[in-house]
Swiss-Prot record:
It comes from Neisseria meningitidis serogroup B (strain ATCC BAA-335 / MC58). GTP binds at L8, A9, G10, K21, D67, D101. It is an enzyme of class 2 (transferase). It is found in: Cytoplasm. Mg(2+) binds at D101. HAMAP family: MobA. This is Putative molybdenum cofactor guanylyltransferase. Keywords: Cytoplasm, GTP-binding, Magnesium, Metal-binding, Molybdenum cofactor biosynthesis, Nucleotide-binding, Transferase.
């Protein structure tokens, strides 16, 4: 089974003062490098969605792409709509989607998603649930459902939560919320 990863690094980083969040440093290392180190052993390919510093991100993965112009500034759904037309991603059986600002992702993230997907083979989308909250921006999805994000976004809808609900996505429970801490501000980075 081929699982690819799509790392979302295309946001405006308004809470980070406009600094490119994926390249912000945590312990002397870019946030995206922490994320790549966590997911690389779990997947066979990594793609990065980013809208700036393309050359810098290309050093980390040759498979990078910006949001298509018509979908820019619609958050993570912009990346999903653009990815819907990416033939390389379409070759995967599953796509792990994670943001660039979660440096503590668990080493068994894909294994846990795979286990649940084998028990529920008709389900095409999963997301993380912890005792504290739902993390809709961490998804394990069939690449074929990405096409449905396009009419969803054109209809004026913009949230991952309702798109995942439309896909009848199921939560996968993780007990330790600390794995999913997102570092959105400079203060978060200092405390991280």
């Amino acid at each position: 089974m081929k699982t690819f990863a799509l790392i979302l690094a295309g946001g405006q980083a308004s809470r980070m003062g406009g600094e490119d969040k994926g390249l912000a440093l945590l312990g002397g290392k870019a946030l995206i490098d922490h994320v790549i180190d966590r997911v690389r052993p779990q997947v066979s390919h990594i793609a990065i969605s980013t809208n700036r510093n393309l050359e810098e991100y290309a050093r980390r993965s040759p498979h990078i792409f910006p949001d298509a112009r018509q979908w820019q500034h619609f958050g993570p759904l912009s990346a999903l709509c653009t990815a819907a037309n990416d033939l390389q991603l379409a070759a995967a059986d599953w796509l792990l989607v994670v943001p660039c600002d979660m440096p503590y992702l668990p080493d068994d993230l894909v294994a846990r998603f795979e286990t649940v997907s084998k028990r529920t083979p008709l389900c095409n989308a999963y997301y993380v649930e912890t005792p504290i909250t739902m993390h809709y921006n961490i998804m394990y999805i069939r690449p074929q459902i990405l096409q449905s994000a396009i009419p969803y976004l054109f209809s004026g809808m913009k949230t991952l939560r309702s798109w995942l609900q439309q896909q009848r996505a199921r939560p996968v429970r993780f007990e330790f919320d600390g794995h999913f801490a997102d570092l959105n501000t400079q203060i978060d980075l200092q405390e991280g």
